[in-house]
Structure formats: C-alpha cells, structure tokens
C-alpha cells in the first residue's frame, strides 16, 4: 500500500459481526475499520494480492448490488490472471503505480492513476504489475440478479477508460440541498446504462472546501463514496456523522439516506460508484 496510507493502516481482526453471512452491513468504514485479507496466485496469476476490505462478496445478501469493496495492492511482478465472472461485474480503478490491464479482446493497456476498467459478466480481464512500485487499485464487485446474461455476449461494452478520456459533468446543489458545485469526471453515467448492467455509473468526484452533497436517498440504486484525498463529514441514514479521510468507504443501499460535506481545507476527492440489483425486492 502507498506510504501515504501506511501510517494510518491498522490491522483489524476478522470478526463475525463484521462479516456475518446475510446480515446487512453498515454505511461507513474508516481506514482503521478495514479488514486485511491476502490472496495468492489469484485466477491463475502469480504472487500476493493484498486487500483491505470494507466488506466481501462471500457475506453479501442476495439483494445487495455492491457485493465487495477493497483497496488492493500488487507488488512488482505479481499479477491477477486473465479470468471472467459468470454473473458478477468487476471494476478495477487505479490509484497509484503503473500496471498492464488486459481486456476480453486480448488488448493490453498500460494503466496509471485515474484510469478505470470494468469487466461485465462474461468479459475477461487481468491485471499485472511490471513496474518497480506497488500497484494500488480499488476493486469493486457488483451483481444484478435479474440480468439477461446472454445480452452481454451479443453487445459487449468498453472495458478501459483512461483518465484523459473521462468526461466532465458538474452538478450544482448535489443531492437537492447541497452547497456549491460537485465536480465530476466520468467513465460512464447512469443515464446511458442498460437494465442488465449492475454498475450504472463511475465517477471521480471533487468537493471544494465548504461544499457538500445534501442528504438524499436513491429508491433503487446503491451509491458508494470512497474517499481518496481530503477530509469530510459523512452523514448516514440515521443522522450519524463520521469524519472521513483517505481510504474511508461509505455506502447507501436502496432507500438509505446519505450526505457528504468537505469540512477540510483541501479538495475532498472520492470515487462515486452507483449500482443496482434489479432482482432486489422492496
């Protein structure tokens, strides 16, 4: 993990309360509450994939759209083998270092901080670190239980979104009652998503000091804010407030409220990923 994170990392213990099977998770995890878990030779790859997780897919509920969120590290020479998921979607969002991402068409791309990748159901992907620095990335797994999996085969979608090709879309008074401007750079947005896709939107967002996203909820979508830089205050559906900083993970499932305010003196930068499981029942 990057040195900037190292001083803040605390090794936590895997407890049943944290990863209880089928139990609804909370809405906010600070860096000290992430759980460390290493995997070896993932998908036929090589070396250790080090992970620090808010929650893992093995304990997700059927109705959850976002099944897993983790900060992952590959050291020099380590790689995740080329593989595919039958019904999950898997996004790798590069935070630091340089790697090689391989897509389902056997294209290989050099990936750097700010680049975003995704594999929809049935699409192949792999990731390798051939540089001397650690390759650090977010790994977010989601599932739409009502997806027509055959539709993905007949209509493959792009998998690689370089940082310099992300498109801008800014929002005033985000969440309806927010203050200032929410600046966004997007790989894709929910307006163009299909009913089969679980991950509807991925954006790199910025709130200037004092600006905010107002308290709001999504009727059907799940929305995660994953903090990369700066300091802010996250408000959950019960009105609880949390101080969040780098490597804090927040989420609001369908029907839950959430809000975010930049309470620091520097830009608050975060990933905003929206997903939906159309099979979920109210």
Predicted feature locations:
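Positively charged n-region of N-terminal signal peptides that target proteins for export
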Residues: 1-4
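Bacterial N-terminal signal peptides
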Residues: 7-16
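A short, N-terminal "cap"/entry segment at the start of jelly-roll beta-barrel domains
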Residues: 19-66, 81, 113, 147-199, ...
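Conserved short histidine dyad/triad with adjacent acidic residue
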Residues: 55-57, 70-85, 188-190, 203-218
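Short beta-strand segments in beta-sandwich/barrel cores
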Residues: 78-80, 97-102, 211-213, 230-235
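Glycine- and acidic-residue-biased ligand/ion/polar-headgroup-sensing regions
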Residues: 87-99, 220-232
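Short acidic-glycine-tyrosine-enriched beta hairpin
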Residues: 106-121, 239-254
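Ligand-binding loop in jelly-roll beta-barrel domains
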Residues: 121-147, 254-280
């Amino acid at each position: 993990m990057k040195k900037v994170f190292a001083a803040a990392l605390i090794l936590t213990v895997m407890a049943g309360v944290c990863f209880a099977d089928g139990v609804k998770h909370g809405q906010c995890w600070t860096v000290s509450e992430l759980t460390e878990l290493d995997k070896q030779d993932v998908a036929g790859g090589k070396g250790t994939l080090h992970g620090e997780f808010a929650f893992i897919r093995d304990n997700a509920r059927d109705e959850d759209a976002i099944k897993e969120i983790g900060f992952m590290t590959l050291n020099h020479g380590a790689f995740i083998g080329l593989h595919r998921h039958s019904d999950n979607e898997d996004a790798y969002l590069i935070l630091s270092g340089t790697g090689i991402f391989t897509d389902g068409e056997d294209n290989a791309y050099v990936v750097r901080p700010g680049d975003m990748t995704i594999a929809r159901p049935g699409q192949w992907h792999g990731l390798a670190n051939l540089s001397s620095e650690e390759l650090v990335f977010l790994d977010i797994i989601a599932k739409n239980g009502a997806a027509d999996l055959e539709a993905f085969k007949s209509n493959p979608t792009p998998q690689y979104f370089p940082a310099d090709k992300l498109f801008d879309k800014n929002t005033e008074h985000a969440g309806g009652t927010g203050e200032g401007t929410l600046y966004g750079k997007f790989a894709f947005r929910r307006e163009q998503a299909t009913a089969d896709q679980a991950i509807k939107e991925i954006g790199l967002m910025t709130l200037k000091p004092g600006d905010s996203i107002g308290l709001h909820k999504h009727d059907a979508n799940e929305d995660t804010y994953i903090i990369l830089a700066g300091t802010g205050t996250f408000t959950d559906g019960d009105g609880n407030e949390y101080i969040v900083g780098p490597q804090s993970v927040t989420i609001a499932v369908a029907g839950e409220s959430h809000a975010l305010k930049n309470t620091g003196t520097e830009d608050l930068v975060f990933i905003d990923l929206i997903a939906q499981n159309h099979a979920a029942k109210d």
